[in-house]
Amino acid sequence: MGFKGKYPQMVRETGFKLRQYRDGPLDWRLMGSYETERILREQNFELVDKALTHLSEAPLGTVLETHILDSGIAKYFVMSQYAIQYLMCCRTYLDECVTDLKEAHTTAQEEIATLRKSLSESNNEVVQLHKRITQIEAIREVVYPCHLCTKNFISNEALNVHIGRKHRVASPPSLTSATGKEKDRDKATDVHLINTIKMELEIKQLKERLNAAERNIKERSTGSKRVSPRQEQRHVGIQSNLAEPKEKDEDSGEARQSEASERKEQLTGLAERLSNFEEWQTQLKQSNEQFIQDINKRLEGLSHALEQSKQASASTPPLEDRVATPCLEDLERILTEKVAEIGKVSAHRLEEVVYHLEEGYKEKLGALERELKQLSVQKVQPEPVQTVPVASKIPKPVVRKEETNIDRIRKQVESEFLKQKHDDDTYSIEEAPRKGSEKPFPQLVTQVQVVEKEQPSAGSSDSNPTYTKSPREPAPNKQETKEATDVSDSLSQEETENEEERSLTEEEGTDVPTSGSEAAREDPTPKTIKPSGRIIKSPQKPLTRKDARKMVNRKLMSHGFDMKSKGISHNSLKRVNSELTEHRNKLKLQHPHFYATRNRIRKFVEKLCSAKFSERAEMLLKHKSPLKPMEVPGKGIPRSAISEKSEEDIASSQGEEQTDEQTDSSEQQTRSPSPQRLVSRDFKARLEEILVKPAATIRGASKSSLSSRPVPLPRKRVMFNTTEDGKSFNDSDDNLK
């Protein structure tokens, strides 16, 4: 199109790539809000600018494939989208160029202003300097005026000669006729004075010319049009016996004759002096020419010597054959002296630094020796340290010697049917009053919940079983110490991260105390029961759907999403995804053993869930499947059909009541100081009946409950609730009940 810039090459260098968006819905509401005729009529460029981003990222691929049959029209749409993307990239590039040029323009304007200001200041300084120069020159020119006439003289000697010759009193004629020697002396002094005065005048003229030339050069360089004020030239009057006739009495003839003779002598003297002056000038010219010729010859010799030295350096003779000139020797001597001085100074500084370092190390070593002495004294007199046992957060399946696999399964089934279910299938943990134990230290409780989606299988029912870890028996003759593992670190980190969400949704979990049966199991001798100093907190609030929705909204708001918006844009989704991945990578770096613990927990859960039943239980499960927990009878089913039960269901319900009674009795026995629980012999048969019985009994529902909306089935929850002494939360719930 005739543009000067190569925009395709520039766009390719920036790394821009064309993209075709296929995933995602089209915003038909936004496109419906645009009125093309009105935009054309009003020339609404702002609305078109807003629509550019949506048009460039609209997923046209799937829509064009399904809605437009003509491939040419589809290509027009796709090429228009590519063109929009390309033009948007060019616009961003040009915008950046314009901003850079504006910044450069502003900086250039500022520099021009500063330069103009500095130029005006420099011009003012030049003018002031010219004024000062003129003042100094005027001060340096010392003038000696005559007090008897209007003439001025340069030196005091010239003024005295002028007064002695011009303004002296007339002498008698006998004195005027002096000898020839005196006349010769006067002539010599006059010639000398004239020559000195002329030389001073020439020097002054040359100085004035030099000053004028310097001013012109400065004015041309600065470009200032101001003309420096011209200095007034002062003329010096030369006074001698040869220039003017002496004033004598006109009445005496002798005076006239003497004046005539003097004038003749003055004329002859002046002619001689002029000839001498001309000869002196010619001699000066010749000497100057000879001097200039000598200088030129020397310059030619120097240039010739420089050329020879260059040629000699080009031939690169060995360094040993070269003879150092006096200048080079002086430079080498100066350099060696400087290097020696620098070496001395640096050595002195290094000695000071080393001395300071040695003193610091000596002080640190003395402090370390004192600390080691203190530690050795403390080791000599050790104090008994009370170890506070902390419950391990790693779910490790440990089977007691007295307890078999059947007992563990029995406890799991009992705890399953004794738990209370809420609307959102969460379980609240209540704290029981604490019994007396061997040591009055607080026991920490860990709770690990592994939530998995329910996967239907042939042998499993749709109920939500809760598997608990088998109670763990601590070693009787070993002190319990803190167990810090990678699982505890990772779980503690997760708890600190989700502290705000937990505080808004539910209260902090209370510690579940241990029962006195475990203490009795370790030591059969009765112990004194000490009252616990803990305050019983209110039970935890269950997490409902409303709370979960609030928690999700809060999380989304923290990431910058608006709750009023109906969807999440692709860019914001990418941004949040990148932020979460960065956060996850940071957590991976902080807790490198997190995945190891997760795999360990998974293996433990799979091991628990893959417990095999006996052959009789498997046969019963094959012949009869349990009912669903949320199954509700229809309106057309009569109450007689609902109330009818099979003999096996009645037997199973009776077996459940018996197991409940036995669990209550066993709990009462555990509360008593008896050492062991009573285990029934016919538990195996009763367990098989419990496994075959339905998970929930069918009851008649009211009309309001039947007409209400169906509740979706919750996901399966697997909970590992253990305390330090091996008891589970289910045992503590049984104690409370």
Swiss-Prot record:
It comes from the Eukaryota. Residues 457-469, 665-677 have a biased composition (Polar residues). GO terms for biological process: cilium assembly. GO terms for molecular function: zinc ion binding. In neurons of the second and third antennal segments, expressed at the tip of the dendrites. Residues 98-132 form a coiled coil. Its main location: cytoplasm. Residues 167-187, 214-267, 415-548, 624-682, 698-737 are annotated as: Disordered. Residues 1-293 are annotated as: Interaction with Rab8. Component of the DZIP1-Fam92-Cby complex which promotes ciliogenesis in sensory neurons and spermatocytes by acting downstream of Cep290 to initiate early ciliary membrane formation and thus transition zone (TZ) assembly. During spermatogenesis, also regulates distal elongation of the basal-body and their docking (anchoring) to the plasma membrane and as a consequence, regulates the initiation and proper elongation of axonemal microtubules. Belongs to the DZIP C2H2-type zinc-finger protein family. This is Cilium assembly protein DZIP1L. It comes from Drosophila melanogaster (Fruit fly).
